[in-house]
Curated annotation (Swiss-Prot):
Keyword Kinase: no
GO BP annotations, alphabetical order: ergosterol biosynthetic process
Entry-linked InterPro entries: Cyt_B5-like_heme/steroid-bd, Cyt_B5-like_heme/steroid_sf, MAPR/NEUFC/NENF-like
UniProt organism field: Schizosaccharomyces pombe (strain 972 / ATCC 24843)
Null mutant phenotype: Cells are viable under normal growth conditions, but contains a reduced amount of ergosterol and elevated amounts of the ergosterol biosynthetic intermediates, 24-methylene lanosterol, ergosta-5,7,24(28)-trienol and ergosta-5,7-dienol. Deletion mutant is sensitive to the inhibitors of sterol synthesis itraconazole and CoCl(2).
GO CC entries: endomembrane system; endoplasmic reticulum; endoplasmic reticulum membrane; membrane
Compartments, as annotated in UniProt: Endoplasmic reticulum; Membrane
Protein function: Required for sterol biosynthesis. Functions as a positive regulator of cytochrome P450 enzymes erg5 and erg11. Function requires bound heme.
Family: Belongs to the cytochrome b5 family. MAPR subfamily.
Assembly mode: Interacts with erg5 and erg11.
The name this protein goes by in its record: Cytochrome P450 regulator dap1
TM stretches of this protein: 4-21
Domain of life: Eukaryota
Positions bearing Phosphoserine: S108
Length: 166
């Protein structure tokens, strides 16, 4: 009879322990909100490179001029993921050619963006399919612009600011 009571007490204790642990985990899961999305903005390739998941917890990549926040897929695009080569870069050419080779990832210091105009029909279709996938799955957070475009936009802003103050 005493052994029945011991089994009952141990079972009750384990039940309470597990229930308390589950509630604690559920509360922390419920309390964690989806991270705030960055405001829409323009990114140069050098700026985009900062969002590769190593220096910054956010992971972005660009396809056909659109910058996507792929942080929620960081197990794929983050530092240890199979698509990590694309994190912080314009992934257009690599995805179109289904390749992770460095030769298909544009240099972040390049003055002009890769327009992918030399892709064949099959590669263009693959790129369009990837773009459609990213449009449905991930939040667009900006546009990829060339450093030349960024300098031109900065000059226009400075001119507008000077005119406004006069």
């Amino acid at each position: 009879m005493a052994s029945t009571q011991v089994v009952f007490i141990v079972t009750l204790f384990l039940y309470l322990l597990i229930t308390r642990w589950r509630r604690k985990n559920e509360k922390s899961f419920i309390a964690s909100e989806e991270p705030k999305q960055p405001e829409w903005r323009d990114y140069t390739p050098a700026e985009l490179k900062e969002y590769n998941g190593s220096k910054n917890s956010l992971v972005f990549l660009a396809i056909k001029g659109t910058v996507y926040n792929v942080t929620m897929g960081s197990k794929f695009y983050g530092p240890q993921g199979p698509y990590s080569a694309f994190a912080g870069h314009d992934a257009s050419r690599g995805l179109a050619k289904n390749s992770f080779d460095d030769e298909f990832i544009p240099d972040s210091d390049a003055e002009e963006l890769d327009d992918c105009s030399d892709l064949n029909d099959e590669e263009r279709q693959a790129l369009n399919d990837w773009k459609a996938f990213f449009d449905q799955k991930y939040q667009a957070v900006g546009r990829l612009i060339s450093p030349r475009e960024a300098r031109a936009a900065a000059t226009i802003s400075e001119t507008e600011e000077k005119v406004a103050h006069n």
